[in-house]
Amino acid sequence: MAEATDVVLVGGGIMSATLGVLLKELEPSWEITLIERLEDVALESSNAWNNAGTGHSALCELNYAPLGANGIIDPARALNIAEQFHVSRQFWATLVAEGKLEDNSFINAVPHMSLVMNEDHCSYLQKRYDAFKTQKLFENMEFSTDRNKISDWAPLMMRGRDENQPVAANYSAEGTDVDFGRLTRQMVKYLQGKGVKTEFNRHVEDIKRESDGAWVLKTADTRNPDGQLTLRTRFLFLGAGGGALTLLQKSGIPEGKGYGGFPVSGLFFRNSNPETAEQHNAKVYGQASVGAPPMSVPHLDTRNVDGKRHLMFGPYAGFRSNFLKQGSLMDLPLSIHMDNLYPMLRAGWANMPLTKYLLGELRKTKEERFASLLEYYPEANPDDWELITAGQRVQIIKKDSEKGGVLQFGTEIVAHADGSLAALLGASPGASTAVPLMIRLMHQCFPERTPSWEGRLKELVPGYGIKLNENPERADEIIAYTAKVLDI
């Protein structure tokens, strides 16, 4: 007998948690069930050690504003990401202010920087600064080529550096470090207190649609072969990170045809020596190597995890065919069907430089990887650093009318035409834009309810519907308010 519920959220990460809280705030009477394959929430990509936790707001990530062919830098994409992050930040602040999250310990003030180290990159960074400084959301950004000034911002990165090496840096004091694992756990704890059912160690075996439009999920208990649970729901969200593609394919919706995925794993060096970690307080992004994918931009980060400061450097790209860190090596081969084979082959052919880059990364020794860290931290001691494996990122491959298939960096909502099912595919910027992504998903799936939700949404997100960059006075008010509530 199927257990009926209004909403099923598959995946115990930041996306499901965010959508769950939004729906519970907007429709308190709806019954919600969250399913997670592992024994707790936030153990895959939302875990603090499986993501960069940058609080992506485009302050330091250079790949969001590349140099155009005309020599001009367009800040539009960076502004869009910054606007999205501020929507998330407002939502989190409201939940803290209303006592719905335990505290604000999931977010910390950590300056964001960009650091580049050759003449061409220094010239680019100057142009980027010139393009950004006139924008409200980037007005406090600083730029310098003065080595002493840069040393004040990031002393470890300048100590021992060649005096003749050109360097330039951007610095934004308003950057943050977000522990998405802690945030997810706080959100789910709130949901549990509101009656949301959480089913752990549950693997989704099958997804079928009934004649009345309801979705039926058959799940198995990963610890007990006899522990079957069947759920029946009128709205299904597939927010299982890299595992969402497999679930989307199981659903059989026509909108999911032609989608494939390319998994990329990430390695980081982690330093937990408090003496070293206390000397660096910034997230510092560099410039990606030629042919490197966007998620491989090198960065040296201050990370605050469970109240302790660490340093992380990476990522180093790797390849494993599983879609989740704790997934199966058969995930990729089993995801290849007749409808996505051609797009995947075409995308693979068009991205040979990426393939060559990944092969080169895979061949690197630990010493070769450490040499990259020394470019950013010249006096780094190998004994202080351990190499860790972060989460899997599954990049989207989709049909393209002109190219046959394209590899897409970013996130994408794939929803049934009637709004009864939605899946979130892709990766970066990911968690930092969870709130606007889930609001957009709700608008797409529940268009008839959107008008009645507007009032509460404006309470949850005070700047809802407003572009902060275009409303300076309102931006000042909202940014000051969220900074105060979140203690950043």
Swiss-Prot record:
GO BP of this protein: tricarboxylic acid cycle
Q: Which cofactor does it need?
A: FAD
- The residue stretches assigned to a coiled coil in this entry are none
Q: Highest taxon of the source?
A: Bacteria
GO terms assigned for molecular function:
2-hydroxyglutarate dehydrogenase activity; L-malate dehydrogenase (quinone) activity
Key words, A-Z: FAD, Flavoprotein, Oxidoreductase, Tricarboxylic acid cycle
Q: In which pathway does it act?
A: Carbohydrate metabolism; tricarboxylic acid cycle; oxaloacetate from (S)-malate (quinone route): step 1/1
Which Pfam family would be a valid example here? Mqo
What Enzyme Commission number(s) does the record list for this chain?
A: 1.1.5.4
Could you tell me what reaction this enzyme catalyses?
(S)-malate + a quinone = a quinol + oxaloacetate
Q: Which NCBIfam families match?
A: mal_quin_oxido, PRK05257.1-1, PRK05257.1-4, PRK05257.2-1, PRK05257.2-5, PRK05257.3-1, PRK05257.3-2, PRK13339.1
Give the family, as the similarity comment puts it.
Belongs to the MQO family.
The protein, known as: Probable malate:quinone oxidoreductase
Q: Which organism is it from?
A: Neisseria meningitidis serogroup A / serotype 4A (strain DSM 15465 / Z2491)
> Gene encoding this chain?
mqo
